[in-house]
Amino acid sequence: MIEQQKILLDLFKLMEKKDGFIPKEYKPRQDELYRYCWKVKNVHETDFEIVQINECLYFTADTKSFAKNDELKILQLLNYLNGWSYYGIFTYSSLHKTIMYEQTHFCRQFCYSKEEIYDFIFGMTKRMGLYYQSADLIFNNNIPIVEAVNNAKLNLKKRTDN
């Protein structure tokens, strides 16, 4: 077991106490050193995953929420979200009708701490929340993309301020 994986497992124990769940280990796919996944089912269902390939940690999230709507609007929304996000990138699979998010962190000379990894996970879930709220405003309320994202950002900020 490599050092970064040990740190992840320590974090997962803390997440179980704090957040009530623990990511499950899955068989690594080709070139993966390890793979952990979890599913969140609230209003929207999201599959999250952390894998390490060589000296990179990959954090991913996949959802089908809103993916069957107008493809052009989805692509415009994802393009807009990608334009201001300094972590990660959203992509869309028209074949599978899935929205995907991925962020990559290099770990060549060091291991990330539990706190840093938790922050990466928190950031990923926050960006997925921004996608969900923005898409809801666009597809269910006919609000233009820029206005929808701005409103969603404000709403998320209010939540974290409380």
Question: Model features per residue range: what roles?
Answer:
Residues 1-47:
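Charge-rich, low-complexity N-terminal segments
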Residues 3-7, 66-74, 116, 120-123:
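Short amphipathic alpha-helical segments
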Residues 26, 51-53, 92-93:
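Short beta-strand micro-motifs enriched in acidic
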Residues 32-34, 57, 97-99:
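Hydrophobic residues embedded in beta-strands of well-ordered beta-sheets
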Residues 38-66:
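Long, continuous compositionally biased terminal/linker segments
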Residues 62-98:
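Short, internal acidic amphipathic alpha-helical interface segments
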Residues 90-142:
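Charged, low-complexity intrinsically disordered regions
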Residues 136-162:
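Short, highly charged C-terminal tails/helix-capping segments
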